[in-house]
Amino acid sequence: METYLSLVVKRSYPDLIIYAGEVTLGEKVRNKKDSKKRKLEKTRITQAACALLNSGGGVIVIQMANQSEQPERMGQDLETSLRNLIPSLDLQAFFETKQQEDKFYIFVKSWSSSPEDDSTKPRICSLGTSLYCRSLTSKVAMDSRDAFYFLKKKKAYIKCSPTDDRAPPAKIPRTMSQKSLESNPAFEIFQSKKLEYGQRLLFSESTSIEFKQFDTENAQKYMKDIIPEYISAFANTQGGYLFIGVDDKSIILGCPKDNVDPDSLKIVANEAISKLPVFHFCSSKDKNKVSYETRVIDVFQEGNLYGYLCVIKVEPFCCAVFSEAPISWMVDKEKGVYTLNTEEWVRMMVDVGPEAASNDLSRDFECQLSLSDSPPHCRPVYSKKGLEHKVDLQQRLFQVSPDCLKYTPESLWSELCSQHERLEDLVKQQIRSFSCGLLILSRSWAVDLNLEEKQEVICDALLIAQNSPPILYTILGEQDEQGQDYCTRTAFTLKQKLVNTGGYTGRVCVMTKVLCLSSQNNNKTSGGSVSPIDYPSSYNLANIQEMQGLLQALVIVLLNFRSFLSDQLGCEVLNLLTAQQYEILSKSLRKTRELFVHGLPGSGKTIIAMKIMEKIRNTFHCETDRILYICENQPLRDFIQAKNICQAVTRKTFMNYKFKTERFQHIIIDEAQNFRTEDGNWYEKAKGITRGMKNCPGILWIFLDYFQTSHLQESGLPDFSLQYPKEELTQVVRNADKIAEFLQQELQKIRDNPPCSIPQESLNILHEFKWSQGVSGTYEITYLTLEKMVSYITDKCDVFLSKGYSPQDIAVLFSTDREKKAYEHMFLREMRKRRRASHMNDESVCHSNMFDSIRRFSGLERSIVFGINPIATEQPISHNLLLCLASRAMKHLYILYLSTPEGQSSMVAC
């Protein structure tokens, strides 16, 4: 990564602002300027523009070198350089300009491919790709679109290549290419020991042959300049020969011996080729090698050595060879303006989303944000079918009405006004000129955006109004020098996330204003709008449709979380919280220090637990070792610990007298219905820790589902009537339709005949049960002998693995840990036997992590779940055990019961 010190990123603005220094503007004046200085100015502007296009948009600030009271145009060369960056002939599609006194501003909108344009555009902006190919007798530089299709084609070929991980896909075509190059008429010359000056070759230039001639003293420099582009072109096409010392009439002239020596020719060629950047989509071990051979052949004239002919034979490359790193820039406030390396550039260029990786994706999920029409940093956003779309979520959470300015959430607005006497008048005075839009209040917009809270802030209010850009108001009780920094940082993060996470493709900036309750004149405080840049009117939200578009991006910003699909598809995918989940997550932690969250199976309790720990960290400025997560079983503990957001332990470890709790201030408890008191009163211990600091007690949130209780012992939870305050999660978001139907049946059976250890009133939550319908799946119950069960599961796993599923998508769950230890080896042996028979690496397709007990797997999920003889040792919780098993399966559920040796007919529930 190379940074550019000549371009300064200003940090005190709520936008990306790049100061490009002094630049002469105006067509006539620029034409009179020294050409080298003019080129340097153009380079700075081009780099800054490209960096902003790729980073969410922003502003280039130019100090005008030539003073002029009349508005100046940039100059034709600058306009052309900007136009060359974008996929549109309309410069104003991405750039607007404005002159204010001696400053000239270029307002840059984020790069994106227009959804109205059916043609696929590259994901990022580049000045040059550094990729070349051969076209007839020419070397052709690929533009961004050509490079996109070239890389996409290479990636698709590698994916479909019938080779395994031990042999790169290049092996198959390389043999053919070798024969092709050797049958080329140039091969005979390549094999020669000596040639005659003036000899005419019996072949001419073609797609696989290029002639170059030079006899100057700068021969080595000339070679260094031409080799990278020609080697890239041959390697990216079908291979070929580069002759250095032959003119375009096929006559051998050579390089005079007085100007070069044979060893230096080879050294120059080898050094130039060794520096070429390459990118592999395949598993080639020769990660940085272009396959080539250099020959230096003596050229004689009338029997005397005259000079040398240099020939480079290049084989076709399996993936992509560049002449140098692609020419593209990005910017952020920490790094400044910097270049992308080759690997970063390629991965962004071919980042076309997960659609091609899964046939089930469009069948089971709705796309909320596609990469095809989004800014470069966006990740795809999907929601399970049947869940609310971002449009519905926006209407529910942030509805805009014509000719109406609403405050939301109303409950928070009322609460804040009752707590702070001058607040209502102060806010209304600021927004009185707006008649249509929303004022979205939060105790801390910083925390909502995963930044640290500032305790002196009473609240933040985001104004989304017609004929105005978004404005973030930060309201303080007393004057605070750091208030403006907080507001600016929060507004900048919001603007960046609206574009780079929410996928907003319009022009956007977030203005800032800090208000102080103790000040009589907020227009003269440090809270006045800090941005001296006067943005064009195109940054105003012109109508309700534009406001709704921005608010839908805001929904994605606030409700997104990393999806389980990310690991399955091999690329990061985001999901959205439900409105019900978001409402719980939005609670004020300072007001809700203890909370019981009752959630039905698959309603997202663990997701909320993880999100709330992130919120705790930002609200209370605490390190991860101050937050403790407690669950009953080790697999869930390990899953949470890997997230690096807290310290995760099991209940047993927590209750061990050797376990030190002094540093912990906040505790999150998950799957609490399966806790026990055999090692002591865990609830009182947790409460004692979180209440240890009387002036600032910690957070204690407990997540549970009585329906999934897997034992009859005392749980240690307080009486149901004392579990206050409490919230409920009733929308099942995990399971396919057939599995959800089975869950509902089992829930009802438990509701009708609950175990004595479960409070009857806790089961009334079932009345609110609902699931997001529309996802197909499998639910089967089968009776088999143990031997047939092993074959059945192995067959099914073979089918799923052949369809692209991985072992991480599969769980085989036994009733008890003892049964798992007794029978696991039988399944593994059969699976490995099958894999060896098919000559596949058995370690990569089956391992012991696929096997566990139903109880230990609590809180986790898999796409495919096999339940082995799920019979509870304690009859009253038999339906609870089935429920625990079934709720782990997202897509396919197979329940297999042991039949008698005599056999029993299979029963399949469809």
Swiss-Prot record:
GO terms for cellular component: cytoplasm; nucleus. One of its GO terms (molecular function) is ATP binding. Induction: Induced following infection. Induced in response to LPS and interferon. Zn(2+) binds at residues 280, 282, 319. Residues 1-354 are annotated as: N'-domain region. Its cofactor is Mg(2+). It is an enzyme of class 3 (hydrolase). ATP binds at residues 599-606. Endoribonuclease that cleaves tRNAs and rRNAs. Belongs to the Schlafen family. Subgroup III subfamily. This is Schlafen family member 9.
